Design a protein with these regions (language model features):
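Glycine-enriched, solvent-exposed interface loops adjoining structured elements
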Residues: 1-175
């Protein structure tokens, strides 16, 4: 099946439902399209939207913001280096927030070490890095280690102003 543009997909939806734009308004059609795209993105992690974000942990701070427009976090690496995201590193294990709070319940300096675990909480609107959620780390970092977040990004959806997307071109039958 060939891919869709915004215009061809909205026409196909109207033809399938046998109603015109007086009943099936652009607002309703756009919501159908958005829901279908999000379902595809959640169910099929696409290489086209794999992203990485690199930064430095803050000594004594056990949270970091998830990058803006994150659909979900695939993994977190912490490097033993404080200056480069290369070399020796550890993949953090995802756990529930309650596990992390029991594992090391304190952020005091004697309990700090290179993190081993992370948990997701809060946010989840995906609009900015302060509303995309937060990662809780345990134990709390004892140094400014370099970290890399591997995540699936939320792409710009199909719309009247964005007439084609990777999903509309290669997963048209899912829409």
């Amino acid at each position: 099946m060939a891919g869709f543009t915004y215009a061809t997909l909205t026409t196909a939806i109207q033809n399938y439902t046998e109603v015109d734009t007086n009943v099936l308004t652009a607002t309703i059609t756009d919501q159908f399209i958005d829901n279908a795209e999000m379902r595809i993105l959640r169910d099929i992690p696409l290489d086209a939207y794999k992203k990485q974000s690199i930064g430095n942990l803050v000594t004594g701070q056990n949270t970091i913001n998830v990058p803006a427009k994150t659909l979900f976090v695939k993994g977190v690496q912490v490097y033993t280096s404080t200056t480069a995201a290369t070399g020796a590193n550890t993949w953090l294990e995802k756990k529930d927030e309650s596990f992390l709070q029991e594992y090391v319940p304190s952020t005091e300096s004697t309990k700090r070490a290179i993190p081993k675990y992370y948990a997701m909480f809060g946010g989840a609107t995906g609009i900015t890095d302060t509303t995309s959620g937060t990662l809780l780390l345990s134990p709390t970092p004892d140094n400014t280690y370099e970290f890399k977040i591997h995540y699936e990004a939320i792409p710009t959806g199909l719309s009247g102003s964005n007439t084609t997307t990777y999903v509309s071109q290669y997963f048209g039958n899912g829409l």
